Amino acid sequence: MKKLLTAVGVATLIAAASAAWTLAAPAGTGGTKAEKSAHALPPLPATVKSRGRWVIGVKCDFPPFGYITASGKNGGYDVEVAKAFSRLAFGKGNRVSYVCVTTPSRIPTLQSKRVDIIISTLTYTKARAEVIDYSVPYYGATGRLLIPNNSNITKLSDMSGKTISTTRGSIYERWLHNCYKNTNVILTDTTSSALLALQDRRAAGFMYDDAFLVGVAANDPNTKLLAARFLNIPWGIGIRKGESDMRAWVNSRVKLMKARDQFWVIMQHTIPRRFYTTFKNNVPRPRNTLKYPTGPDPETICR
């Protein structure tokens, strides 16, 4: 019974976090004017054009980037980027179907051709870049650790001997494995399950992207974020290998949206005003270019 109540509490917390992030969608982002400007850019891939709509994989449990709203619709930053792609391709924001994906399922879903692309909080890694192509970056994330208010973890090295939850297949799984070998790790397929492990005290902390954890901490008076920030690595849109026409279209439109500062417009309509300062440098803007890391994989660099 206690576990059931805790699970219900986590579901409520996720819903509250989603509601806290939810704001009015940016009306007309990437609309007719952008469509005209995009006319001379690489053409829409034939498969998408003939279908008359996009099919895009997005997260459904990751506010404020991809989640299900109270009215049962897809919402979030990634979803608004998908709608902008729809406007740029077809002149309307509703020419897109969404497929819910999780961290471990998103690349297989892309490779099996169930979707055209994935806009799903996909952090760049060299290993992933060997099996799929990345677009130019469209967001820059930072890792954080969510802990109970009464936790004795004050720095990352305090995780030694403790149990930390995160999602399977995430960059945090590999970083913990490489750099914190004395830390036990609970791996889950969804963020809600990883959060549940923290809530029912199976885990001493939940490691994940700041964008998700800030919303949780803001709605749970029993938790807080450790001050340490780590693994500041951009996200890209996932594209199948060999689809050069798709890569050309996506990259050109991301660059167009960057030049028009449309990612910041989307972000402003995704997060509450009090978080503007926190996230203002997380999106590509005319004077803010995000770059993927070079050299050793960040998840192999310990601190």
Question: Language-model features: where?
Answer:
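Extended ligand-binding regions for polar small-molecule ligands
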Residues: 34, 38-39, 79-83, 87-88, ...
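Short helix-initiation/N-cap motifs at beta->coil->alpha
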Residues: 41-42, 96-108, 151, 171, ...
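A ligand-binding cleft/hinge motif common to bilobed small-molecule-binding domains
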Residues: 105, 120-130, 175-178, 192, ...
